[in-house]
Amino acid sequence: PYSGGTYSISKNGRYAITYGNVYNPSDLAVGYNGKMSRLTDLNKDLFDYKKLGNVEEVWYKSSFDGRDIHGWLVKPPNFDSSKKYPLILEIHGGPFSNYGFRFSAEVQLFASKGYLVLYTNPRGSTSYGKEFANLIHHNYPNQDYDDLMSGIDHLIKQPFVDKDNLFVTGGSGGGVLTAWIVGKTDRFNAAVVAKPVINWYSFVLYADNTNFYYKYWQPGPPWENLEHYMKRSPITYVGNVKTPTMLLTGENDYRTPMAESEQFYTGLKLNSVESMLIRIPGASHGIAARPSNLITKVNAITAWFDKYKK
């Protein structure tokens, strides 16, 4: 449920936009002089026969410093409050990005398979002001972990959450945090790390924008800041991992190259941790750009989680 969209404005002030909400993918709308009308309803036939999970806003306090953290909980279709459901923590990438009250096929697919899904905006997320976003400047990952764990702590107080069946996944920056999480806690039954950075030292030297990453995300080049790079790298904590962990990355991903996933996978195998590495042929960093890849990704993640349910 990332932010984003497309618009076009004419010289006379008329505009066209992509328009959607948490229960509808984007359609086309036009507007002028304070009025807007929707032109398309591309998924009406589908939604006449498919029921979506309800999406509810959640606020909670971070255990680190008491900051308010914003999130959303997606419930399975036909949710029954008298039952208990497994919970997936789904973490956004970026890390300077945000989730919101927007449609996500991936999240709804998780919910359709009987999972609660929590997605949040930990520190570093955009849309909450400059100060909040910059809390992770040269400090990522770190206290964003506390923000995420506080969300889990908040939700497991609800009687419909099965606290014995907790799972975690995320892609790109969310993959970084997922790998970080399993190096810091064993509370999750299983994890899926998608297209992550695992070793900041190697990443800044061969990813697709080397002139950017070491200047803005790090305090300088790695050979001058070895301790900092390794302290913030999930590979440093791979020896702590006991959580069954799947990794998946596109073979044509130049943003978070395959070798990042391979490093973590090898570390897990050397420590006899149950693990799997999925290489997605032809896929770039945008795995879901091909719809069949999105469906396969969700099926792989839920199959992994189903395997480790209690």
Regions from the PLM with identified roles:
Residues 1-18, 48-51, 56-57, 100, ...:
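Conserved beta-propeller blade repeats
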Residues 25-26, 98-99, 201, 256:
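Glycine/Thr-rich phosphate-binding loops of Rossmann-like dinucleotide-binding domains
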Residues 29, 72-74, 278:
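Conserved hydrophobic/aromatic positions in well-ordered beta-strands
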Residues 23-39:
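Beta-propeller blade-edge and WD-like acidic-aromatic loop motif
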Residues 21-22, 65-67, 175:
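Short flexible coil/turn linkers enriched for glycine and charged/polar residues
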Residues 16-22, 32, 62:
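Beta-strand C-termini and the immediately following turn/loop, strongest in propeller blades
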Residues 119-310:
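Active-site-proximal cap/loop segments of hydrolase catalytic domains
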Residues 34, 42-164, 171, 203-213:
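Cap/lid segment of the alpha/beta-hydrolase catalytic domain
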